[in-house]
């Protein structure tokens, strides 16, 4: 199965109950995900001999399968496809939260080059920045999971100035949108989320 998937440029995912470390090692997995969400399984004989994984790539500890699946798929897909030397568009922002205005800007960024790097400013949490950086990244990964490999998301310092010399080989551009898109307000979105108890 794995050989055929690799020949077709695809990724094979296998789900096993494998209580022994040496048995798991025989799969020669590129990435190992440990779903660690229960104290014991329903099979007593498996519980008795179970050996916890020593080292895994991902350790899922909460019952939020859809969320974790999207995040893990995004991260693994990115490793296979992202090309650091390919022409890339950069977007810098707080994304508190990611909204249709950001999406419209992102769509234009993708149209300029084949991949986009999203830089999340690491802000102190307050009313205007309710999400810590790691939660912003999770939200972005869920929103953009279908573009894994074409989008890279990074936390950067709280950047307030960007300086450059002449002849640098890249452009800094402001995108202009229609009034409906331009008027999308993250402040109003946060206020509505608070009213609905989502924030």
Q: Model-predicted segments: where are they?
A:
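ATP-dependent NMP and nucleoside kinases share a basic, alpha-helical "lid"
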Residues: 6-7, 14-55, 165
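Nucleotidyltransferase catalytic core that binds NTPs
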Residues: 79-199
